[in-house]
Amino acid sequence: MKRNINLFKCGGDKMYVVVVYDISLDEKGSRNWRKIFGICKRYLHHIQNSVFEGELSEVDIQRLKYEVSKYIRDDLDSFIIFKSRNERWMEKEMLGLQEDKTDNFL
């Protein structure tokens, strides 16, 4: 009997992704900005300054996050991933500095 066992899901359903990042441009930040830009360009389409979009599988999103996390400084930089399987809903995920401009209530 032949079994077809898929131990690793390579790909899966794709979802629409928007990536937005803000890197502090001190001496190390300039280098990090270039590295992050290059990583994002490999996975997504560049649409504006530090904004990218495209369709990625969950596996590719995890790879992107892993690669970028090497250059994000938690106290200075932010990297935001908006994900949606449906056009009406987006999931917001943040790495690094998490300053939410809409959260100003005491």
Swiss-Prot record:
Belongs to the CRISPR-associated endoribonuclease Cas2 protein family. CRISPR (clustered regularly interspaced short palindromic repeat), is an adaptive immune system that provides protection against mobile genetic elements (viruses, transposable elements and conjugative plasmids). CRISPR clusters contain sequences complementary to antecedent mobile elements and target invading nucleic acids. CRISPR clusters are transcribed and processed into CRISPR RNA (crRNA). Functions as a ssRNA-specific endoribonuclease. Involved in the integration of spacer DNA into the CRISPR cassette. It is an enzyme of class 3 (hydrolase). Homodimer, forms a heterotetramer with a Cas1 homodimer. This is CRISPR-associated endoribonuclease Cas2. Mg(2+) binds at residue 22. NCBIfam families: cas2. The gene is cas2. GO terms for biological process: defense response to virus; maintenance of CRISPR repeat elements. It comes from Fusobacterium nucleatum subsp. nucleatum (strain ATCC 25586 / DSM 15643 / BCRC 10681 / CIP 101130 / JCM 8532 / KCTC 2640 / LMG 13131 / VPI 4355).
